[in-house]
Amino acid sequence: MENNTSLQQQLLEAGVHFGHLKKKWNPKMLPYIFAEKKGIHIIDLNKTVECLQETAAAMKQIARSGKKILFVGTKKQAKDIVNECARRVNMPFVTERWLGGMLTNFNTVRKSVKKMQSIEKMLGDGSFDSITKKERLTLSRDKDKMEKVLGGIAQLGRVPAALFIVDIGHEHIALAEAKRLGISTFGIVDTNCDPNKVDFAIPANDDATKSIAIIVNYLTAAIAEGLAE
């Protein structure tokens, strides 16, 4: 990984330091706030670098041990980045919407995944040739709908070892489920959120695409290193 100064410079250029309006702040973020500028809280990038490196080391360790980290980012600024990075390191992801019970009711979700996979297989191998075109179309549409929501976790055979969340406020249901099951949590935390809600908080702008991209890419590189070892 690059030295701290160049990493800090990259974070600065990506606008990682821009927090929310002061009036929206969560006082628990105080240790991570450097200043206030024109009514907006500015995040201390020294702290961001520190937290990012700690998170990267922990994620690398999980990946090295062969366990899975579930990437969660359903807001529009995060979707594409999360999808692309998770695929790059063969990690599961949720980018459309979080289905309640995705973790706490994992067995039921697995059944839906299996149903989706069997429809897919049967559509491909001619099993449905005897049904009408309309019925086949309906099945195909059902499969596509399921694929959209469940596609990213199709290969996840068991509950993941950890969750990596972009915007812990937006993904509060996913976070609550992980906490209930004692799953490790990593999260990008902006100035309007409570950093104590995750095991590893990365203080950063969670609204700008560039900011999300630099952090997710950095952590994905750490996971890739862990997988290679």
Identify the role of each PLM range.
Residues M1-K68, T74-K75, K79-M122, K133-R136, ...:
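N-terminal cationic and glycine-rich segments that engage phosphates or anionic surfaces
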Residues A174-A176, L181-A228:
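Short glycine/threonine-rich loop/turn motifs
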Residues V89-N196:
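Long, charge-patterned amphipathic alpha-helical coiled-coil/hairpin "stalk" segments used as oligomerization
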Residues V72-K75, I165-D167:
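Short His-Asn-centered micro-motif
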